[in-house]
């Protein structure tokens, strides 16, 4: 068969296969056109998941009759002033959207430019163009797309259900609305109530308002502002506190020069920044906006314009990591649990008990048969730690359980009679008052109370100490007089012996001790006396999971996290008041103490006003 030039209609349909993948692609292209036209309000309506109808109305600059006739021609655009594709400052620039849509659907455009006495309309029916005719419309443009893929019915069988396609459309609109909080958006149709996002004020407050409207109140209340700039690149936006996570990366919204993108480089940078805060199966929620000179980024990578290529990718990645780490460190003690709203809701009874009849209050609680006995004073004697003693893991390695006298056999709450020093009440985490279930420390602050998970808090402290020691002078180690002989599966032994250098950097010296056994000769002094067998099994399991894919630095941090978990005070360990206060003070001095190495919160803070609401005092 000889080579021949394809007809224009076939060319447009081929191009439509790249540009118009599904109804959401049509909405994306048309909304981007509205944004480029300077619209301050954009209304979107869809029906049948966008297959039956899509209508986009904006109040932008509109088009003249001549521009309208040219707009549906292939590669016709008003967005490039010259031949330089390295100066792209608009969302659209290829001039393919309208002719591609018109080649596979019934396209109708009505538009009015401010210089025109009336509006103009044009229709394209599967590639067949009609003449431009007068019409009625205020300034702006209305684009309607009906019977999508009418000319290529084979494409219809690849579409999902109407509900799924409608949700994909809403996700496209959400991303564009995040990028432009100064524009009002309304999306309606699909037999659902319309959703409107009003135009927000410029700047970070307006940006956070728009993000909160779209991502929800949880994100707004836990959002951390991040910002960093170097040379011609700037990164800003908001990142959720580590306690607010998702099971996938769909909550990560990335924008480059106002363009929503999906970039593996940026996603990898986000993951690296959160590595110290989240387990591998959880993902952060962020909205990051990268701004740089258009000449430093190539947006002409894919027809859908969802991918970009950076000239200096290393700088962009470093800035994102720096911005996120700085913001997370600044809010290091902040967790989702700091807001006592969810906790108060959990405490609140499901029903209101009947109000008792008013009468004389002559009940004596001290003589009630159900009243607990008075607390018995404690005498810690020589076992007590000084109040200012450093809180070290070694002090908690298999200690004798602190003595405690319980007022009643069924009591779960142990009260210490030592009053808190006034200055401790002014500390961020207050003064320790008691311990619940040998697991949670209850501390009093000047305006409320704090409940601390002692294991999670201590785990973060030990982890940060291990990291600091590794980066400074190396982890101090203790030589065991009698080596611990640990019997393990041969596969586990091989995995551990293959990483002896990594383990040695943390003060854990092991060597082979025959088939299926290792000898532990040195352990990190920070961890005190540890269960060597349990630690080695967990390390081997995690090493098998990491493999060689992770960089050495990340593997070392995983080793540190595993060691910290094993070297921390356990739940169920009774603590003395001095020990509890020492732990609180260490938390206040430790970076990122708001969550443990697995992303769980280390403490909950309740304001006195919240507690008073529980009892109807407010």
Swiss-Prot record:
Residues spanning the signal sequence: none
Cystines in this chain: none
Pfam families, alphabetized: DNA_mis_repair (PF01119), HATPase_c_3 (PF13589), MutL_C (PF08676)
Described function: This protein is involved in the repair of mismatches in DNA. It is required for dam-dependent methyl-directed DNA mismatch repair. May act as a 'molecular matchmaker', a protein that promotes the formation of a stable complex between two or more DNA-binding proteins in an ATP-dependent manner without itself being part of a final effector complex.
PANTHER family: DNA MISMATCH REPAIR PROTEIN MLH, PMS, MUTL, DNA MISMATCH REPAIR PROTEIN MLH1
Protein name as catalogued: DNA mismatch repair protein MutL
Entry-linked Gene3D superfamilies: 3.30.230.10, Histidine kinase-like ATPase, C-terminal domain, MutL, C-terminal domain, dimerisation subdomain, MutL, C-terminal domain, regulatory subdomain
Record flagged with keyword DNA damage: yes
Taxonomic classification: Bacteria, Pseudomonadati, Pseudomonadota, Alphaproteobacteria, Hyphomicrobiales
Assigned protein family: Belongs to the DNA mismatch repair MutL/HexB family.
One MF annotation (Gene Ontology) recorded for this entry: ATP hydrolysis activity
């Amino acid at each position: 068969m000889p080579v021949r030039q394809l007809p224009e209609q076939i060319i447009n349909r081929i191009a439509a296969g790249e540009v118009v993948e599904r109804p959401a692609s049509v909405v994306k292209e048309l909304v981007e056109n509205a944004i480029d036209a300077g619209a301050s309000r954009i209304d979107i309506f869809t029906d049948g998941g966008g297959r039956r109808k899509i209508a986009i109305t904006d109040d932008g600059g509109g088009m003249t009759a001549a521009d309208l006739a040219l707009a549906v021609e292939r590669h016709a655009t008003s967005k490039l002033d010259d031949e330089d594709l390295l100066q792209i400052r608009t969302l659209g620039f290829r001039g393919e959207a309208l002719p591609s849509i018109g080649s596979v659907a019934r396209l109708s455009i009505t538009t009015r430019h401010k210089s025109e006495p009336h509006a103009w309309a044009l229709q394209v029916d599967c590639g067949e163009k009609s003449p431009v005719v007068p019409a009625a419309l205020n300034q702006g443009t209305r684009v309607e797309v009906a019977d999508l893929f009418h000319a290529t019915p084979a494409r219809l069988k690849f579409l999902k259900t109407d509900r799924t396609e409608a949700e994909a459309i809403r996700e496209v609109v959400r991303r564009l609305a995040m990028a432009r909080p100064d524009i009002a958006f309304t999306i309606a149709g699909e037999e659902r109530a319309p959703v409107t996002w009003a135009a927000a004020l410029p700047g970070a407050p307006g940006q956070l308002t728009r993000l909160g409207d779209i991502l929800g109140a949880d994100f707004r209340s836990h959002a951390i502002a991040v910002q960093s700039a170097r040379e011609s690149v700037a990164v800003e936006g908001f990142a959720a506190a580590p306690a607010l996570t998702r099971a996938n990366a769909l909550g990560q919204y990335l924008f480059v020069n106002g363009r929503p993108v999906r970039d593996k480089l940026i996603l990898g940078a986000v993951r690296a920044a959160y590595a110290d805060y989240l387990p591998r199966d959880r993902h952060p929620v962020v909205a990051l906006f990268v701004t740089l000179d258009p000449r430093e980024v190539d947006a002409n990578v894919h027809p859908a314009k969802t991918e970009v290529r950076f000239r200096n990718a290393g700088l962009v990645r470093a800035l994102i990591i720096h911005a996120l780490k700085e913001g997370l460190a600044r809010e290091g003690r902040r967790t989702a649990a700091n807001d006592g709203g969810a906790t108060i809701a959990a405490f609140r009874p499901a029903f209101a008990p009947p109000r008792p009849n008013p009468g004389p209050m002559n009940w004596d609680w001290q003589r009630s048969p159900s009243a607990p006995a008075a607390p018995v004073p404690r005498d810690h004697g020589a076992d007590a730690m000084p109040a200012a003693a450093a809180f070290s893991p070694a002090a908690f390695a298999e200690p004798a359980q602190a003595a405690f006298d319980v007022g009643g056999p069924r009591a779960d709450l142990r009260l210490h009679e030592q009053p808190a020093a006034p200055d401790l009440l002014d500390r961020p985490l207050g003064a320790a008052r008691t311990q619940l279930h040998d697991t949670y420390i209850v501390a009093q602050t000047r305006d409320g109370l704090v409940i601390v998970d002692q294991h999670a808090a201590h785990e973060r402290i030990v982890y940060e100490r291990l990291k600091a020691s590794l980066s400074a002078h190396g982890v101090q180690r203790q030589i065991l007089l009698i080596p611990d002989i640990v019997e393990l599966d041969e596969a586990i032994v091989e995995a551990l012996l293959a990483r002896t250098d990594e383990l040695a950097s943390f003060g854990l010296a092991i060597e082979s001790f025959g088939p299926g056994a290792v000898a532990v000769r040195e352990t990190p002094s920070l961890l005190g006396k540890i269960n060597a067998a349990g630690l080695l099994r967990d390390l081997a399991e995690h090493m098998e999971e990491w493999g060689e894919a992770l960089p050495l630095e990340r593997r070392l941090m995983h080793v540190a996290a595993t060691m910290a978990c094993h070297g921390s005070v356990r739940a169920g360990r009774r603590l003395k008041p001095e020990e509890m206060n020492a732990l609180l003070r260490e938390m206040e001095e430790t970076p990122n103490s708001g969550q443990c190495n697995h992303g769980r919160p280390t403490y909950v803070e309740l304001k006195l006003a919240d507690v008073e609401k529980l009892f109807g005092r407010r």
